[in-house]
Amino acid sequence: MQPRVLLVVALLALLASARASEAEDASLLSFMQGYMKHATKTAKDALSSVQESQVAQQARGWVTDGFSSLKDYWSTVKDKFSEFWDLDPEVRPTSAVAA
């Protein structure tokens, strides 16, 4: 073989090797980017789940406090007006007797 042909073949082999290395680097880079996107999404999902749980606990507390206040208010109203509701069976309003 002529030296020029050998030189061209060697340069082509070197160029092909460099391209293959770039393809591997690009594929590794895209793999790592995909992995980081997945890890970021997982972390965000976990954080939002914890925050939703805390919000749900706070909302349950508010609802419980609201029902407790309503129950206390109803008890107070019931006690104040119980004298009107508890009529003595012996004391009945008199009705006019027609003669």
Swiss-Prot record:
Which organism is the protein's source? Answer: Homo sapiens
Function of the protein: Component of triglyceride-rich very low density lipoproteins (VLDL) and high density lipoproteins (HDL) in plasma. Plays a multifaceted role in triglyceride homeostasis. Intracellularly, promotes hepatic very low density lipoprotein 1 (VLDL1) assembly and secretion; extracellularly, attenuates hydrolysis and clearance of triglyceride-rich lipoproteins (TRLs). Impairs the lipolysis of TRLs by inhibiting lipoprotein lipase and the hepatic uptake of TRLs by remnant receptors.
What gene is this protein translated from?
APOC3
Kindly identify the disorder that the protein's record connects it with.
Hyperalphalipoproteinemia 2: A condition characterized by high levels of high density lipoprotein (HDL) and increased HDL cholesterol levels.
* Carbohydrate attachment residues: 94
> Primary place of residence?
secreted
* Signal sequence, renumbered to the chain: 1-20
Q: What is this protein called?
A: Apolipoprotein C-III
Q: Name one GO biological process term.
A: negative regulation of low-density lipoprotein particle clearance
Q: Does the keyword Metal-binding apply?
A: no
Instruction: Map out region (Lipid-binding) in residue numbers.
Output: 68-99
Q: Which tissue types show expression of this protein?
A: Liver.
GO CC annotations, alphabetized: chylomicron; collagen-containing extracellular matrix; early endosome; extracellular exosome; extracellular region; extracellular space; intermediate-density lipoprotein particle; spherical high-density lipoprotein particle
- Family, per the entry? Belongs to the apolipoprotein C3 family.
> Which keywords does the record carry?
Chylomicron, Disease variant, Glycoprotein, Lipid degradation, Lipid metabolism, Lipid transport, Secreted, Sialic acid, Signal, Transport, VLDL
Output the InterPro entries linked to this UniProt entry: Apo-CIII, Apo_CIII_sf
